[in-house]
Amino acid sequence: MSENHVPAWKRIALKRQTISSGDESKEKGQSNLIDDDPLNITTHLSTGNLTKKEKKRIINGESKSSTKKGKRVSKPGTKKKEKLSKDEKNSKKNKILKDQLRYLIEFFRTKSESKFPTGILELESVKENYGDSLIKDEPSESGVVEVWKFSKQKQNWLIKHFFNLDEIPSVYNDLLLLYFRDLQGKSKEELISKCKGKLKQWNDYVEDQETKIKALIAEDKASEPINGEEKEEGEKDGNAEQGKQKEVQDEQEEVQMPNKELVQRSLKLLEIWKNDDSEQIELKNFFVDV
C-alpha cells in the first residue's frame, strides 16, 4: 500500500464528519441572520434588555451591520481673520454710509434745486456709494428719476441725533436744515426747546467768562503800587482782597463751553422757524462760521 492510501472505513468517517460540521455552520449562519433580522422582535424582546440604539434600529428596520458609523472626516479649521491696523479700520469706517444719512442725501437730491455742498461731495463714504452722480450739472445716464420715500423711523433717528456730531457731522447741516424746515407737531416743539437750551448754554458761558475777566482786571488794579506811606498798607489790603476774590472764584461752578458747531446748527434752525410765535433768543458774542 502507498502512504497516501486511506482505508474505506476512515473515508466514510471523515465524510460524515464533514457533513456534520457543514450543517452546524449552516445552522449558525441562519441563526445570525435571524438575530440580525429587524422584524424578529420576539428574539429581542425575550432578552428584556434593549438599548436605545437597538430599539431605534428595530423601529427603522436596520441591521446591525448598517448601523456602523464611518469615521468622521475632520473639517479643516477656519483661518483666523487678520487684524486690521488702526488706519485701515478708520479708512474702512469712513467708507460706510449710514442709511439715515443716505436718506438725507436722497431727500436733498429730489427736493432741492441747489447743488450739493462741496463738503458732502468730498466725503469718502459718499464717493464710495455715489461716485460723481450727485453733481447736479451732470444728467443721469439712465434717465431714471429717483423717488424719495418718507420714513418715520429715519426721521425720529435724525431728531434724536440732531445734537450728535459723531452721527450727523456738521457737513450735513444744509441737508438737515432743509429736511426739518417743514417739520410740524410735537417733534418741532421739542426740537425748538432743545435748540433754545443750547443757545442759553452759550450765553451762560459768555457771561461766566465776562465775570471772570472783570475779576482779573480788578485784581490787577489792586496789585498796582501806591505812592507814599500808604504803599505798604495798600499792598496788604490788595493781597487780602485778591485772596477773597480767588476763593469766591474757586467756589463758583465752572461753566463749560458748549460745542460751537451745535450752537450754530441750533441757531440756523431757529432762524428758519423765526416766523413762528416762539420767542427768539439773541446770542452774545457769537459769530457764525461761513
UniProtKB/Swiss-Prot annotation:
Residues 66-83 have a biased composition (Basic residues). Residues 233-249 have a biased composition (Basic and acidic residues). One of its GO terms (biological process) is maturation of LSU-rRNA. GO terms for cellular component: nucleolus; nucleus. One of its GO terms (molecular function) is RNA binding. InterPro entries: WKF. Residues 40-50 have a biased composition (Polar residues). It comes from the Eukaryota. Transmembrane segments: none annotated. Residues 17-91, 220-259 are annotated as: Disordered. Pfam families: WKF. Signal peptide: none annotated. Present with 1850 molecules/cell in log phase SD medium. This is Uncharacterized protein YCR016W.
